[in-house]
Amino acid sequence: MSHHHEFHATRHIQNILTNSTLKMLEPDGTPLNGIEGVPGVSEIIDSGIEIGADRIIMQPGSAFELHTHPGAHILYVMRAAGFIHVDGVDYEMTEGDTVYVPAQFAHGVKTNPEVDEAFEILSFGVPHLPIDSSERMSVVTHS
């Protein structure tokens, strides 16, 4: 039986509040300013692609410019408030909100300038790429 049909507690239970943070990277490999991530659980599923969830911590004033991901993902706001930018519009996201973003769909995420605390979101995606992978997102050069 393959590994993705088994449960391994040390690998399949991860605390995204206490695990170590990692720098998140631009597609060219440079660290994103003011943004870190905490890896959560991930596993290869039947289709051979990886599923996973990570915590992203955005310091006040930081932003992800317009970008896409290879797969669809769901964002869950854990703390504070921010905005998701879709089709030229900023939509506010507050604690408890869940947002679905289709695969290859251009979007941006930024903090709320009126909120002086870190904006924390849970990003759950398929396929999943490691939090510190420079291939996690592709920047969109035009809107």
Question: What are the residue ranges of the model-derived segments?
Answer:
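Short acidic-glycine-tyrosine-enriched beta hairpin
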Residues: 88-104
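Ligand-binding loop in jelly-roll beta-barrel domains
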Residues: 103-131
